[in-house]
Curated annotation (Swiss-Prot):
Catalytic activity: tRNA(Leu) + L-leucine + ATP = L-leucyl-tRNA(Leu) + AMP + diphosphate
Underlying gene: leuS
Family according to the record: Belongs to the class-I aminoacyl-tRNA synthetase family.
InterPro entries hit by this protein: aa-tRNA-synth_I_CS (IPR001412), aa-tRNA-synth_Ia (IPR002300), Leu-tRNA-ligase (IPR002302), Leu_tRNA-synth_edit (IPR025709), M/V/L/I-tRNA-synth_anticd-bd (IPR013155), Methionyl/Leucyl_tRNA_Synth (IPR015413), Rossmann-like_a/b/a_fold (IPR014729), tRNAsynth_Ia_anticodon-bd (IPR009080)
Broad enzyme group: ligase
Organism: Escherichia coli O6:K15:H31 (strain 536 / UPEC)
Protein name: Leucine--tRNA ligase
Keywords per UniProt: Aminoacyl-tRNA synthetase, ATP-binding, Cytoplasm, Ligase, Nucleotide-binding, Protein biosynthesis
The keyword ATP-binding appears for this protein: yes
Matching Gene3D superfamilies: 2.20.28.290, 3.10.20.590, HUPs, Isoleucyl-tRNA Synthetase, Domain 1
Amino acid sequence: MQEQYRPEEIESKVQLHWDEKRTFEVTEDESKEKYYCLSMLPYPSGRLHMGHVRNYTIGDVIARYQRMLGKNVLQPIGWDAFGLPAEGAAVKNNTAPAPWTYDNIAYMKNQLKMLGFGYDWSRELATCTPEYYRWEQKFFTELYKKGLVYKKTSAVNWCPNDQTVLANEQVIDGCCWRCDTKVERKEIPQWFIKITAYADELLNDLDKLDHWPDTVKTMQRNWIGRSEGVEITFNVNDYDNTLTVYTTRPDTFMGCTYLAVAAGHPLAQKAAENNPELAAFIDECRNTKVAEAEMATMEKKGVDTGFKAVHPLTGEEIPVWAANFVLMEYGTGAVMAVPGHDQRDYEFASKYGLNIKPVILAADGSEPDLSQQALTEKGVLFNSGEFNGLDHEAAFNAIADKLTAMGVGERKVNYRLRDWGVSRQRYWGAPIPMVTLEDGTVMPTPDDQLPVILPEDVVMDGITSPIKADPEWAKTTVNGMPALRETDTFDTFMESSWYYARYTCPEYKEGMLDSKAANYWLPVDIYIGGIEHAIMHLLYFRFFHKLMRDAGMVNSDEPAKQLLCQGMVLADAFYYVGENGERNWVSPVDAIVERDEKGRIVKAKDAAGHELVYTGMSKMSKSKNNGIDPQVMVERYGADTVRLFMMFASPADMTLEWQESGVEGANRFLKRVWKLVYEHTAKGDVAALNVDALTEDQKALRRDVHKTIAKVTDDIGRRQTFNTAIAAIMELMNKLAKAPTDGEQDRALMQEALLAVVRMLNPFTPHICFTLWQELKGEGDIDNAPWPVADEKAMVEDSTLVVVQVNGKVRAKITVPVDATEEQVRERAGQKHLVAKYLDGVTVRKVIYVPGKLLNLVVG
């Protein structure tokens, strides 16, 4: 064994061994308990970042630990390979998205191997290959036949100059990112999947997910947004149709003083024919892209349509306004406004001088003060005719019942969730498998024409999708009749909604899934990824699983038993102000810093001499130039060091602060482990451990070893507090470093301890542990070694620590058997030099003994 720890030598050797032996390839084995450990698959952007490294290290630690427990562990990896960034990169680099993507996959695959992740590479998949997306296309056509897919017009961001649809992130300050033309809202036909048909099940089954974070479940509950309320119909004077609104607060209905409709509502459109101000307002709304998240904070604007609706219960006429806070795609595109008891309605009414009518008493029974804000709490009704004096629940029911009896109201359960629009007017995605015949009939692409293959050898102009620009691509025939293919492609969330299931049978050619393999491995035992995916990906992931279940492919209700959301990776961020006042962000690698005595940064500059402003720790990002390249760190310290730091620096679900001093600390620890094994093995062969012949000190050390095994097992397996597991191993290492190694049983005990330490560290730092296991002559490869088991007998405290005082002052601490008598304790204390010197030539007048804890000798 070489004396120095050289990770660059051992890591490549061990990785080659894993490749050649196909160590992590698995097949279904009914005789073994399975464990499916999955990290969210990466987008092949070109390089791994520290967020990836953290995510995949957590997964690998869990997978390796479960493998050592004797389970049949599946840990696959693949590539979420379609998406918009590839189109931009292709234009920039004068290539096509496919070669750019495949080059990135090859590069990042090497990076993953360099980090020593134990993946089953035989199951690797890339979602941009026809072998993958053909089954997604087939499944879509089956959903269409079941009535779960439909087409309707929907608003998109449209650049009139480029004549193309823009993704939300391509709209900068209301303008096209390429040509700066003002973006318009345009209605175009798009495909939808009926996720709303599963809304109740998606909501109710959250209660089955005991091992998902409550935050994620709450976000999904709110996103699905189930509410119970009443749908109310208003007659409108001089208008051919009625207006329908939905409210969850029918108890406030007597306080409704106006209605608001979306700018795109037919009533607003009709009113605009003779109202230039309203027409201009509608145009303004059409060209304003509003994300739902921004609705709460944006300025509320509106224009009176001139129409008057009739309140069904009071008979009063109330105005109908067009307002920018009502969206056509939500509900009916119309809302009732109760400004006395809804803050948004209150602000709008105050701005435009509309009537504010209170109908709910304050908590103390007085009339509410509405001079500053609305009263939004529930309470007892007044100013409400026959409903006066009713509390919230009674009023809800009484008003709902009356409206229903009059034929102008209906109790309804509503959902905030909208059907999933899966059409994208992009090129780099899976083609939607639908065709249109010459007579306008729309139908699924026949099975014998699947997959509809996306051409990869294309020229990108950065404006139009190549399959939209080439009229020949769309031409096909169905049953001998000319037809045109759909030129939209799938939302890339489609591919990432079922990849976890395809990993169970990536080579299967008879269908989307091999049910036997899928049902052996599924559900996923632990799924690891960022909380930013809580409502989009993780909802579609659950939805797709239920669709596949109802198609008879899987027999479980949910795709993953446990979800672990890892925290973000933070790093120091610095900038200097340029000549034009702009911020120039400087990488922390290039910052020369001064720190105070507590290690805090007080001053910083870069190599060019710029004084740097330190903004603290923030998420690693390109925008702040504070990302740390994992490859540089691996080349400097080794993969094991980077992995160990990642798992030790913070609990897995909390943010991790990147500190190179911490990386250096992890590296020093691994060097200490190496050194201890080197010194131990250099002394030659070891005798068998005789536990019955151990001294008290040896028993105490062995007790520490087995207590550490018990703690680390619990920390990794049950608690998933990996940082505390590592801390416990480090504490044990400190004790082992001080332990005597001269005697035969000292060395035998050290052998047992080091074999345990190396196995406990193996999930975290597999390369060094693989090597040290061989040096310690462990049986076989460590990859097939069992997890160490704590010896219950060894952990029993058969000795205890007694404090020895002379005249009340502590003079020594002695270890004695737990069943030692007072005489034996006194005898042992007298043998201690630190005690004996105070007893020399004096008389012991009194002895105070607290069994197992304290011996106080009073002398004089």
